[in-house]
């Protein structure tokens, strides 16, 4: 019986490997025909993404003394992509990881035709409706801010509205569980929604949005920030 079991396992794994190899070969062939064969190389997509982020960051205007480090660069790039596509986003990290600064830089650079750089004049202006979360927050208050942002968007011209939930993690301390309202408004929202938090929320919220979790900065990032 042991021999038969071992033979069955060997046959199963052989079949599985053969199937995966066939699927991978077919996928690679389709990938090559699509014109993106260069991305098949290890790390090619990551390098391309880093170059796009670098170009994006080079067109951002920041105040003197603000370092365009990795945290701020990634936050800005992902934040802009999510806002333009109305994808909910949570930026999670300790104080000092450029969460609030990210939104300040986005709103000061994306002003439509009044943007300080030509690069951003092709994008719509960003209008932020902010709600400061706290342990006293209520689901009704969050819902009202959301509806107000939606009404603004309905009458806006060449403008994208973003609901900013600042310190959203603090609302989890409320016994009334006000963040349960996010379960519905995070599903295909007509506006962009961004939440900033010092710690991760429960999976019921996080799984409904893109999430950036800022870890400890690298030595290179610390050096760049201090320069």
Positions of the model-derived regions?
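A short helix-turn-beta junction within AAA+ P-loop NTPase domains corresponding to the substrate/partner-engaging
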Residues: 126-127, 201-227
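Short, structurally constrained coil/turn elements
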Residues: 122-124, 187, 205
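AAA+ P-loop NTPase catalytic core
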Residues: 1-161
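Conserved catalytic/switch belt of AAA+ P-loop NTPases
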Residues: 111-112, 146-155, 160-196, 201, ...
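Short coil/turn segments at secondary-structure boundaries
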Residues: 94-96, 103-106, 142-146, 175-178, ...
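Conserved nucleotide-binding/hydrolysis micro-motifs of P-loop NTPases
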Residues: 86, 96-98, 134-138, 169-171, ...
């Amino acid at each position: 019986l042991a021999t038969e079991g071992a033979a069955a396992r060997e046959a199963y794994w052989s079949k599985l490997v053969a199937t995966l190899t066939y699927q991978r070969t077919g996928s690679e062939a389709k990938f090559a025909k699509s014109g993106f064969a260069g991305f098949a190389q290890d790390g090619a997509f990551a390098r391309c993404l880093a170059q796009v982020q670098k170009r994006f960051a080079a067109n951002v205007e920041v105040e003197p003394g603000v370092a365009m480090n990795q945290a701020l660069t990634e936050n800005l790039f992902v934040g802009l992509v999510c806002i333009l596509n109305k994808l909910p986003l949570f930026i999670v990290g300790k104080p000092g990881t450029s969460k609030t600064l990210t939104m300040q830089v986005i709103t000061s650079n994306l002003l439509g035709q009044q943007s300080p750089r030509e690069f951003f004049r092709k994008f719509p202006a960003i209008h932020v409706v902010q709600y400061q979360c706290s342990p006293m927050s209520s689901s009704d208050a969050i819902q009202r801010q959301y509806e107000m942002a939606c009404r603004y968007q309905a009458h806006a011209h060449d403008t994208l509205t973003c609901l900013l939930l600042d310190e959203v993690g603090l609302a989890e301390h409320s016994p009334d569980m006000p963040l349960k309202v996010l379960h519905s408004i995070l599903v295909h929202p007509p506006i962009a929604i961004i939440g900033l938090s010092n710690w991760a929320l429960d999976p019921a919220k996080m799984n409904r949005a893109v999430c950036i979790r800022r870890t400890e900065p690298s030595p290179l990032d610390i050096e760049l920030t201090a320069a």
